[in-house]
Amino acid sequence: MRRNKTTYSLLQTILVACLLTVTPTFASNKPTTDESGTISHTICDGEAAELSCPAGKVISIVLGNYGRFSVAVCLPDNDIVPSNINCQNHKTKSILEKKCNGDSMCYFTVDKKTFTEDPCPNTPKYLEVKYNCVVPATTTTTTTTTSTTTTDSSLIVDEEEEAQKDALNSDVIKPVKKKEDVFCSATNRRGVNWQNTKSGTTSSAPCPEGSSGKQLWACTEEGQWLTEFPNSAGCESNWISSRNSVLSGVISSEDVSGLPEFLRNLGSETRRPMVGGDLPKVLHLLEKTVNVIAEESWAYQHLPLSNKGAVEVMNYMLRNQEIWGSWDVTKRKEFASRFILAAEKAMVASAKGMMTSAESNVIVQPAITVEISHKIKMSSQPTDYILFPSAALWNGQNVDNVNIPRDAILKINKDETQVFFSSFDNLGAQMTPSDVTVAIAGTDQTEVRKRRVVSRIVGASLIENGKERRVENLTQPVRITFYHKESSVRHLSNPTCVWWNHHELKWKPSGCKLSYHNKTMTSCDCTHLTHFAVLMDVRGHDLNEIDQTLLTLLTYVGCIISIICLLLTFFAYLIFSRNGGDRVFIHENLCLSLAIAEITFLAGITRTEDSLQCGIIAVALMYMFLSALTWMLLEGYHIHRMLTEVFPSDPRRFTYLLVGYIPPAIITLVAYLYNSDGFGTPDHCWLSTQNNFIWFFAGPACFIFCANSLVLVKTLCTVYQHTSGGYLPCRHDVDSGRSIRNWVKGSLALASLLGVTWIFGLFWVEDSRSIVMAYVFTISNSLQGLFIFLFHVVFAEKMRKDVGHWMYRRGCGGSSNSSPNHKRHNVQRDLMSPGVNSSTGSDFLYNTNDKYLTNSDTTNRLVYNGIMNHPNQMSVYQQHPHHQIYEQQPGTYDYATIAYGDMMPGHRVAAPPAYQRLAVAEGRYGSQHQLYQGWHHRPPPEFSPPPPPLSTGPPNSRHYGTGSSGRRPPSSKMSDDSAYSDGSSSMLTTEVTPQGQTVLRIDLNKPSMYCQDL
């Protein structure tokens, strides 16, 4: 029994192999009509289906099968046996009925997305469809039985019977909820208005001005137009018929100068906007002209002019992508193959008119390069290979070229052989290769790989006496070198050298092998001459529908949250921090730029219907995002300036305003002048990634990120020096935890503000198929406004103080720092007040965990609150062991500080301990002991204070205590921005004791600058 099963399996395998051998594999066939008028059509997976009926009739689907039922239909490679040849999507017919019934024409793509599910994954599939063309008013009854038309294997499914079984097995009949209708939005293309179109239907409209006929546009089930442009294959420009008549007249009259003139006029017409129906018509005119050039002797006189005109027309046709998009894949391959043959035939014919052996004919256009060489004398060739085209010999740029071996030329004629070379750009997109099915290593399964043409189409052939000679089976291979852009091979793998089969309209790898490949060049060795290209597999996978939906949802929700937070931040600064200085001004502009950019993004990123409007939106997005990035750079620069400049400078708002908005405008203008078509893509109103155009935005973004990273590192170093690099008496371990927390919080805020999230966007530019980068960039970038709001409003102590002061001034509550036993006096701030423009003032005061008892004894703690009576200074200094007795200046009060040591000359002694400044209760509390929070100064910066100005007044005599010597006169007012000054303070003066120690003296007539914001 086991032997019988083995024998059966072996026979089955042999039978399948025989079927593959004797049964030709065919692709999509042309529609056929049987005796009853039913139209049958088979379309391979991935190709466009076109169902149509004559005028006055509509489609009525009879049969629909999507799957695989045969080993001989739509199989890209005969060497691969499908793992499943008996699979079908049972929803095919019902889907086709909803999509096509009642329409005169129906367009859709045959793939699993159209039919909602894949009946047999990793297996090439195809669609079999049968339909009738009926009068719209006629009610027709169609069979519900679907079957295949092949004899290899058939599958019969009765959909009505299956539905009845489902109804019988169901205990409860659930109400069917009608799906809400989805429409493709109305738009205007080339002056033609397209109305809102129901999903799953096809809309028709008149052809653009200057053409006649009818154009169609299919709306997908998702409510999106199927293609970028309407299908204008049914349109024809009005000048086509007149040009056809002119050509017929030239040929009949044998007008020698008429052919170049006709081609020149035809080139002028093809420069204008065209419609899809013009493509085969113009191709027919070209082929008709080329036949005359190649076969009629009277046309030889102006061959160079005629060939130049023909190549110019081909160039314009190849560069017009819109007219190619109106045709399905098979038609595009056919038209592309005919263009190649027409160019070759015209140039080969010109070889007859070349009078001397040294003459050559070269025509170069942006999309086409063709050349006929002079007659090659092998006896004078020193090498085994001859390089073509001639531009590859003298042009310093990288030019696609062909190295033809001596062996190939000797096979023809060693002294009379000519070489034809051709190179076509933009043509590979129309000659797309079929998906290849390969076996998965180590398993019995197969997978389908998508491939893409990544090179130009390069051709070479040998000519003898004006006729092309076939060359194959060479012992020395032909070496073809392709140069391509690095961006064109990104995310691609597995390069394959192939040649074009004009009969089968497909790429073939036989006879060619890969010699060398890198990011910019590929070299192939082939044993024959024809037209060659390089194919590569698409690596990775596109975002599926779930990922796309989730990313879209995250983007919209995140952007809405970000916009709200940015506007809240903007108004918080505008209301509560009006006198905040340049930093607040930068924050306001940053928030405003980002908010406008994200509002524009939400409102216009998908408005691709109108190309002009889409381009304007892309320009606005680029400018606003560049402006936001520039303000981020200015923020980093300003923070660094605040921490490094000794003296506060004048406000720079006007300078910041120019830098924040003018350079982004210049970059955007240069990008627009370089390539205005780069603004707006078929999918989004953003910058195109073609030809590296996206780097007009990504380049400045990279620069700003790198610059801000340097600023961040430098700023953190400066902050670290201020917090832990001061003098030993000024450092307090009890405050190290708070200092570190503030340092980390500030670093995170700065890192967020300086655009760290944009690095994920740059990674995504490099790997656009990375789902991880897509999610990370979408979430982090869309929530950037939330980060700014949290770090600069919610968690910002300065903002909380500003809000408290704002409420206190309006009588909404006490100051944020007030208490029943501790009242402080508000001091009117000016431009030099703490927290405004100071770089070293009150920002360097911080509270401690030290607690002190206060009483009437001021010897141990020298305090000041602006209203207290001061003790006799002589008695104070007599009791303090670290101070000598001397007479003070009128109206001043000694304030102890650290010794500067070497900064002032004199004898160095131990400095007194650092003094804490304490708040004092009102007089009514008497001498009750109160416990208050202590405060320390930040350590002074590590630089010498500036020298005092020369005194202009008469010197005051000083009477120091006994035993003093080497006394110095007191210095004048300290620098307004020195280590212990807060910008506008005039209270403090310095005094040098007889021992060389420096103390600060407080002028009691000045306002109490250090009693605020503690």
Curated annotation (Swiss-Prot):
GO terms for cellular component: plasma membrane. It is a multi-pass membrane protein. Disruption phenotype: Approximately 17% arrest during embryogenesis and 56% arrest at the L1 developmental stage. Defects present in seam cell positioning and division plane. Unfertilized oocytes in hermaphrodites. Five-fold less sensitive to the inhibitory effects of emodepside or imipramine on pharyngeal pumping. Irregular defecation. Glycans are attached at N4, N473, N518. Residues 814-833, 932-994 are annotated as: Disordered. SUPFAM superfamilies: Hormone receptor domain (SSF111418). Residues 28-555, 606-613, 675-692, 767-770 are extracellular. Residues 941-952 have a biased composition (Pro residues). Has a role in the establishment of anterior-posterior polarity in tissues during embryogenesis. Required for the alignment of the mitotic spindles and division planes. May have a role in cell death events. Required for normal defection and oocyte fertilization. Involved in sperm function. Operates in pharyngeal pumping during feeding. This is Latrophilin-like protein 1. It comes from Caenorhabditis elegans.
